[in-house]
A protein has these predicted regions:
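Catalytic binding pocket for nucleotide-activated donors in carbohydrate/polymer assembly enzymes
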Residues: 1-123
Length: 125
């Protein structure tokens, strides 16, 4: 079932994504980066369905740990959603891979450690 929620807080969104198979994201102002929403969707156990950004193309694998769509081809979105929802194995594999990647690279703890290394002038290893 498609559920379109009214506006929710960040905490409420985490609960919604935790009960969802897919979290739909639109990269409004972050065309070269990533938003917290993407990490939150991945960490919730849902498949993240988002338009692409340079950062996402370089740090995620489309159809492996994220599903990216093209805003100029929105007519393809219903088919993409149907494919994800009709193949439980693919959906679960994608969500699990996204969770592992987000847990390894996209938590606030990881980001804090990266910032501290930058401040100290260390490389990002």
């Amino acid at each position: 079932n498609l559920i379109i929620h009214k506006a929710v807080t960040v905490d409420e969104a985490l609960d919604v994504w935790g009960h969802s198979k897919i979290g739909l994201n639109i990269m409004t102002w972050h065309k070269y980066g990533m938003t917290e929403r993407i990490a939150d969707i991945c960490l919730s156990g849902a498949v993240c369905l988002t338009d692409a950004s340079e950062y996402l193309r370089n740090n995620f694998n489309n159809n492996e740990n994220i599903i990216m769509y093209d805003l100029s081809r929105l007519d393809e979105l219903p088919g993409i959603i149907n494919n994800v929802l009709s193949d439980d194995s693919f959906r679960k594999h994608t969500a699990d891979a996204a969770y592992l990647l987000a847990k390894e690279k996209h938590t606030w703890k990881i980001r804090t450690m990266e910032f501290l290394r930058m401040i100290k002038g260390e490389n990002n290893k």
